[in-house]
Each structure stands twice: as structure tokens, then as C-alpha cells.
Amino acid sequence: MYQVDINCDLGESFGQYTIGSDEQILEYVTSANIACGFHAGDPTVMRKTVRMALEKGVQIGAHPGLQDLVGFGRRPIAISAEEAYDLVVYQIGALSAFLKAEGSTMQHVKPHGALYNMAAKNTELSESIAKAVYHVDPSLVLYGLSGSELALAGERMGLQVAHEVFSDRTYQTDGTLTSRREPNALIEDDELAVQQVVRMVREGKVHTVQGEDISLKADTVCIHGDGIHALQFAKTITSKLKEASIRLKAFQ
């Protein structure tokens, strides 16, 4: 039987601002990537999200991003490899403390937004991020875009790597995600998104916006928690994957 991890970016509320339906979405995912205060989240939200995920039996990972609350960490910012290393170590440490306080441990690390996309193409940045994860805890799993520089850097570093695919994003022929600045970046039709995921998991293929099929590895599927239809989509995709005889299981 085919199996795949379903991960979601959570804990992205902060202060008086509520983003997403974290508690409900946790019913449908196997792994949670929790924001660590730079692109979103705050200490109280981090603590509450950790507790909710533990109560649901969901694996927990750090979701470090660029220090850009206004841009939600989705705007590219020029940073050095050293700065990338420092901000990843810092944010892993912050979430690790909350997990330790709850008597638990972290399972993985997945960079957020622009940091994730920059590292997917930039060897120097990707190596710094992989090194940061390895130096904090070599047993952590690194989540990276399938086949990207980040995933390859993690493997070279000796980390276990989960090659990630996206349910609601379109792909370019080089395996990267279509920029959110483009009108065709998002897949808003649930049925099309489900079809894309099932094919990626079962066949290791995805159809690009250029009209070509490319190969990729699908260890984990990302669903975004900040969209207005996120909860309904989480319900739909988990139900349809099970109907397609695909087992939902946290990455190990």
C-alpha cells in the first residue's frame, strides 16, 4: 500500500491576530510545522499549538522563517549563509524549549515561505540551513521541496530528508513551485488538487504549467493552514487519499 505524510503550517497567529483553524485542522494531518515567532507566531501561540498537536498525536516540527511579520515571511530578503544558519538555530531552539516543557521532542524542521524557496535553489543557503539543523540535533528530519538544493544538502549533511510536494501549488519544469506572484500559482479546485497529489504519491509524477510531466519523490504533502478554505480542503484531501488506498502516516 502507498503511504504519505500530510503536513500543515500551523501556529501562525500572533497577538490579537488569528490565522487559520489550527485545532480543527490537526484532526486531519499527521505532522505540524509550527511557526517560531519570526514570520508569524508568538510565545503563547507556540505553547498552545504544541499542546494541541501533542493531544492529537501529531508529529511536531519547527517552521523557521525570515524575520518579516508584515510580509508573512513570503518576501525574499537578502541574507548571508551565516545569517540563515543563525536564524534557523535560534528558531529551532525556541520551539524545542516549549516541547521540552511539555515533556516531548521535535521530529522535523521545515523552513517557511521565502526562506524555503530561496534554499530550494541556492546551494550556499541550503547548506547553511542543513548544517544548522544537524548541529542542533542530527536526528531531526529536514523537510524540503522534492529534489531541491535544500533536500540534497540535507542528504549530504547526513540528515534524514522528507521530500515534500504541494497539493495546492503548480509546478515549473525545473521542479520549483510557480511564484505566488503569478496568476496560476495556486490550485483552487479541490478535485484538481487531489488528482495532483494522488498522482504524485502513486506515480511520482506531476504535470507542470509548461505542459510537461516531471518526476519527483513524494514523502510528505503540504496543505496550507492560512487559506480561507484550508479546513474544508484538509477534510477533502485526507478523505480522497484514503479512498485511493493511500495510507496517511507521519514520516519516519
UniProtKB/Swiss-Prot annotation:
InterPro entries, A to Z: Glyco_hydro/deAcase_b/a-brl, LamB/YcsF/PxpA-like
Oligomer and partners: Forms a complex composed of PxpA, PxpB and PxpC.
EC number from the UniProt entry: 3.5.2.9
Major enzyme class: hydrolase
Taxonomic superkingdom: Bacteria
Phylogenetic placement of the source organism: Bacteria, Bacillati, Bacillota, Bacilli, Bacillales
Cysteines engaged in disulfide bonds, as pairs: none
Keywords: ATP-binding, Hydrolase, Nucleotide-binding
Similarity remark: Belongs to the LamB/PxpA family.
UniProt catalytic activity: 5-oxo-L-proline + ATP + 2 H2O = L-glutamate + ADP + phosphate + H(+)
Biological role stated in the UniProt entry: Catalyzes the cleavage of 5-oxoproline to form L-glutamate coupled to the hydrolysis of ATP to ADP and inorganic phosphate.
GO molecular function: 5-oxoprolinase (ATP-hydrolyzing) activity; ATP binding
Matching Pfam families: LamB_YcsF
Listed name of the protein: 5-oxoprolinase subunit A
GO BP annotations listed: carbohydrate metabolic process
